[in-house]
A protein has these predicted regions:
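Short, functionally critical alpha-helical segments immediately adjacent to catalytic or ligand/cofactor-binding
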Residues: 198-219, 230-231, 264-265, 289-294, ...
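A short, mixed-charge helix-start or loop-turn motif at secondary-structure junctions
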Residues: 171-176, 246-253
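Secretory-pathway/luminal and periplasmic proteins that interact with or process carbohydrate-rich
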Residues: 212-221, 237, 295-307
Length: 359
């Protein structure tokens, strides 16, 4: 139970100390497991929700209230398992989630927060992604409060958990075009990074979509972080070394959207201009870069030959479609094969949109 108590103490102390502890002990997986066990004790079997690349999940009020934003399917569920002050607690959480900003990057706040989310006098993260009952975007607290009251009077639902406790919930749908609204939020950063590193902005946007669906809070089970799911000790360390920096980026650093996009794009630059620079055809290179972003350079070249120079020669001797076919069918990782297909499909289907609307 030590790590669970550590989690509680971390929540009530400076997060930088907790980040340091987790970094020094490689206790991330254990921390997640302990956290999940605690959630199961409170909410019941099959009720564990933990933040992921395309899911924002936050607990509050002694873990009895939680918010879940599913960025892939486009909905928000706010629920409580406690009947004590349930309307008050749900109302408060609805207001907080509608007005939260994308600067709430404290690592442990992705598990639990015991204070009100920071609400700044700036555009909320979900602005224009959620419309109220008058079909208007929500910017001010009184708008969020009014919408919360409407939802609680018309959309409140109740179900039973596996341990026969009542769970009260409100579901809010994001607008159908919620993805493009999130793209717009980070477009300037993507364009600046694209120009700085010479990486196609359509490729950057496609990778962000498949990695996180433009969820700035994204954290994976492998501890990949942020919009581009950068791993501190691999891509993060490589980029820092290229930039003449010591060590690796912190979690808080990578949970900043601008830092994350710059780091992820810098790594794409390293893949296309250093590690895979020997590939001549730009389309073949793009396929290799996409696959390597997910699985690493060695695994990509190893699909063609154990010898890297021979692998590059083989790639250069065949057509781009053949390169894609070999990577898609012969890469040893099913995840990497699927990743290449998804990123490439999104890239092809949206290239003209990215090139015209977002330039």
């Amino acid at each position: 139970m030590f790590l669970f108590f550590l989690l509680i103490s971390c929540i009530n102390s400076k997060n930088i100390l907790c980040d340091s502890y987790i970094n020094n002990t490689n206790g991330f997986d254990i921390l997640i497991m302990q956290f999940a066990n605690h959630i199961e004790d409170i909410w019941g079997l099959n009720e564990i929700l933990i933040a992921g690349p395309k899911d924002y999940v936050k607990y509050s009020n002694q873990y009895t209230v939680r918010s879940h934003i599913n960025f892939s399917s486009g909905y928000i569920i706010i629920e409580t398992i406690s009947s004590n002050n349930l309307i008050k607690n749900l109302r408060k959480e609805i207001i907080n989630i509608l007005l939260m900003n994308d600067k709430n990057r404290s690592f442990l706040s992705f598990f639990y927060i015991n204070k009100k989310l920071e609400v700044l006098n700036k555009e909320p993260f979900l602005y224009k992604q959620v419309l109220d009952n008058d079909n208007k975007p929500i910017f001010l607290k009184w708008q969020a409060a009014r919408f919360a009251d409407y939802l609680l009077s018309t959309h409140l639902k109740c179900r039973l958990s596996s341990n026969f406790r009542k769970i009260w919930s409100i579901t809010i749908q994001l607008i159908p075009d919620h993805l493009s609204k999130r793209i717009q939020k980070y477009l300037d950063i993507v364009q600046n990074a694209s120009r700085k590193y010479g990486v196609d902005q359509s490729l950057i946007l496609s990778i962000i979509q498949i990695e996180s669906s433009f969820n700035p809070y994204a954290i994976s089970h492998a501890d990949a972080l942020g919009l581009m799911q950068v791993v501190q000790h691999s891509a993060g360390r490589d980029v820092f070394k290229m930039q003449g920096k010591w060590g690796q980026p912190s979690r808080i650093y990578l949970l900043d959207p601008e830092n994350n996009i710059n780091t992820g794009t810098a790594y794409l630059f390293m893949l296309q201009s250093i590690y895979l620079n020997g590939i001549i055809n730009p389309i073949s290179k793009r396929y290799a870069v996409i696959s390597a972003y997910n699985s690493g350079v060695n695994s990509v070249l190893g699909v063609f030959s154990k010898n890297h120079n021979q692998a590059l020669q083989m790639i250069n001797s065949i057509k781009p479609d053949e390169v894609f076919h070999i990577l898609y069918h012969n890469h040893p990782s099913l995840e990497s094969r699927s990743y290449l297909y998804k990123v490439n499909s999104f890239f092809k289907n949206n290239y003209n949109i990215f090139s015209i609307e977002y330039r």
